[in-house]
Amino acid sequence: LNQKHRYTLRFIWCGSEEQGLLGSRAYVEAHKEELSKILLCLNFDMTGTIVGSHRLMVTGNSEIDHYIKFLAKEIGFITKFCDDVHHSDSAPFANEGIPAIGFMRDGQAGGHSRFDIPWPLSGEQLAAATDYAKALIHRIDSARTFPFNRTIDPKMAETVANYIHPKN
């Protein structure tokens, strides 16, 4: 990624996800004027665990889904795919109409409990997800036009809104 970029890349870290997405909600609220310029959110949550398999979760549209599947196949990144709302820091962005790709590994046990400890992390698994993310960012950044629409399918947008603002 040591090159001049076609698009602005912004890396943010959000705190207090487990307490209700407090950091990502605060970021979205503090940057309302800039949100229309954000084309995509990549969210990394539980990507480096030894147990499980890679998973990419698209909160967006089928164009994004096809794009990431093609790239994964092209570079040999073995992963599962799903289209759903990632219950993580990308959700407040998706609620504002910003598509998201969630990077994670499924199959880990003990998350969000006293058993949520760092020893089951794998540098190899984290590197695999990072290599795919770098390839994705490079591919998008090298495109003459942004490669997919900045949209979230209506049914998915409704699911996001219900997650962000639950009706108790």
At which residue positions do the language-model features occur?
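Metal-dependent peptidase/peptidase-like ectodomains
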Residues: 14-108
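Alpha-helical metal-binding/catalytic segments enriched in His/Glu/Asp
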Residues: 1-22, 133
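A short, structured beta-strand-centered segment in the mid-to-C-terminal lobe
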Residues: 5-6, 33, 43, 128
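Noncatalytic linker/hinge segments flanking ATPase motor cores
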Residues: 8-9, 50-58, 79-88, 122-126, ...
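Sec/Tat-exported extracytoplasmic proteins
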Residues: 1-4, 13, 31, 72-76, ...
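His/Asp/Glu-rich mid-to-C-terminal helical/loop segments that flank catalytic regions of hydrolases
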Residues: 1, 7, 109-168
